[in-house]
From Swiss-Prot:
Record GO cellular component, one term: cytosol
Sequence positions that bind substrate: 231, 253, 256, 322, 355, 409, 414
Protein name: Histidinol dehydrogenase
Keywords recorded for this protein, A-Z: Amino-acid biosynthesis, Histidine biosynthesis, Metal-binding, NAD, Oxidoreductase, Zinc
Amino acid sequence: MKIKTISGAERLSLKRSIDAGTEEQRKTVRSIIEDVKANGDQAVRSYTAKFDCIEIDSPLVTKEEFEEAYTSLDSRLLQVIRQAIENIREYHERQLQSSWFYHRKDGTMLGQKVTALDSAGVYVPGGTAAYPSSVLMNVIPALVAGVERIVLVTPPGKDGLLSPGVLVAAAELGIKDIYKMGGAQAIAALAYGTETIEPVDKITGPGNIYVALAKREVFGDVDIDMIAGPSEIVVLADETAIPSEIAADLLSQAEHDKLSSCVFVTDSMALAETVSAEVNKQLETLPRREIAEASVRDYGCIYVAETMVEAIETVNTLAPEHLEIITQSPEALLGSIKHAGAIFLGRYSPEPVGDYFAGPNHVLPTNGTARFSSPLNVTDFQKKSSIISYSQSAFEEHAESIAAFARLEGLEAHARSIEARERRISK
């Protein structure tokens, strides 16, 4: 794993560019979306056959498939899923916002009305892999928010079936509307509807570049959570950290994808050299060695700063999806961290704890967007309406000022809207 010393000037070049896809990929996605809008289920079936190599006549998961999923899933794993649900729900319930109102002395009442979205569509990656954790992390905040209709889509395997873990996770949350479809065609079906699926108000969940581009295309007609890029981890550590643990944590993200980013930031060259050697050692025995090696080679790096203050500045420049702080006193550094999707404090809080079990959401901003965005949360499934109720006395007191403001902007009809009421009051 390559090692670099880092200075203030060099930090400016660290930001990773966002993969917006090629023009050919964007054209393909637009074509798929238009086809689904025009031809509905027929188009979805056609693309499922083309891309997933399976003919699916009826994409809706049946009651029998749910029953088979429960039968085939190990009882221990069922308990793990249920415990994770409890943890995730407990955390997200603390995010729930309520409507509020207040009154001024002149009789004015102002407020904010909080309302859950009517519907949401969740995309869960599938095909060759299974991600029941994605079901939990996307569905639970929507349920806590009060979303009434939640639809889930996920690509089928080559046998036309879905992962038992995914089905059981959904069933444990009361989600029955699950459709075997993936890719840009599934995003289009959620956004615009087909004969089988009613359109939804918001689409969440990660996917490949075609899913990401499709979400970008439909945004505005529906809401989306974010455009997720490859997974990222930054580990910030001092000489008190254990090198083998740091290496294991870096590789936990490197094995996700050849495009995943794994970065170690420290103020100790000795630790940097030991961790680099440990990464190479652990790579040799990884089942997903080819993927992890490509990630480490192309997007992995160890940055050595002169001081911990400079190391923290490097972290804030990177604005990573996941940040682990493994130092003598990680809590003391927390206040200096400005930009990170999720922050894991101490050696007993490695990133997989948050991926699956702790409670906070694992749908996190990537590609440096933690500078201005947040993890998926309950408020993403709520919307707010401003409430304004002026009393007659308040209106009379401020009417002249409001009309003057309208004319300042050259909007005469606005001013007359105010004055029409003034005249009626004065009669």
